[in-house]
Amino acid sequence: MEFKVDTHTHTYASGHAYSTLIENAKSAKENGLTMFCSTDHAESMPGAPHYWFFSNQKILPRFLEGVAIVRGVESNILNIEGEIDIPPSVDRNLDWVIASFHEPVFPPANKEAHTEALINVIKSGRVDALGHLGNPNFDFDFEQVLKCAKEHNVAIEINNTTLKGNSRVGSVDRCHEIAQIGKALDVYFTTGSDAHFCHDVGNLELVSELMDNLDIDSNKVITHSAKQFLSFLELRGRLPIAEYDEIRNA
């Protein structure tokens, strides 16, 4: 499957990534993307920036190197109540919010606690996607969470870095199972490189292989085209981004 959007990328602002936004944009262009989301870690993650960094993305151009730039964040799930570490006042300046578990922020607990946290995150209405769910340290009830995501139009991320097998060890088989259940439940999928260096932006080869093997419908993969991605944002209740009208109407 082909993807024109990468919804999970990091710059050096995340504290443990190594490229600038311009470098990421250049790589995105070289790798054939139409659009990518810049999603640095929110402030609870060690080394991550203050929330002002995310609020101030309003000053960013909508295109760099001819590639559309989506203003986003990878927020941290803080607790079983489903709170994330971005103040609600910042929401209006963001186009795309991922919520993820990270061990330094949410110490792994048990399946029930993780399930409750994910469901509450979804029901909060503040997040557009759940990130790298395959991590075995954060086991959860796949079917229960994915049903909730389907009901609330929250996308399920398939993460290329996870599928390499050397990060979040033990995730690969779980990612396949999550994708199979998601297909059966007709959820929306998104695809993220989780690039922490510019050369990885748009590297979604393993995600493509997984989706082809499972025969996932490209109409349910919001990153298959930039137009599909923008339609999903509107489905989520976000206002159309005027600068992307040409993409939307293509």
UniProtKB/Swiss-Prot annotation:
Residues noted as binding Zn(2+) 2 in the record, renumbered to the chain: 16, 41, 196
Any one annotated GO CC term: cytosol
InterPro entries reported in the protein's UniProt record: Phosphatase_YcdX_put (IPR023710), PHP_phosphatase (IPR050243), Pol/His_phosphatase_N (IPR003141), Pol/histidinol_Pase-like (IPR016195)
GO terms classed as biological process: bacterial-type flagellum-dependent swarming motility
Keyword Zinc included in the entry's annotation: yes
Cofactor binding note: Binds 3 Zn(2+) ions per subunit.
Entry's EC annotation: 3.1.3.-
Gene3D superfamilies from the UniProt entry: Metal-dependent hydrolases
Top-rank taxon, per record: Bacteria
Binding site for Zn(2+) 3: 74, 102, 132
MF term (GO), any: phosphatase activity
Cofactor needs: Zn(2+)
Binding site for Zn(2+) 1: 8, 10, 74, 194
Swiss-Prot/TrEMBL keywords: Hydrolase, Metal-binding, Zinc
UniProt similarity note: Belongs to the PHP family.
Identification of the protein by name: Probable phosphatase VPA1527
Biological classification of the source: Bacteria, Pseudomonadati, Pseudomonadota, Gammaproteobacteria, Vibrionales
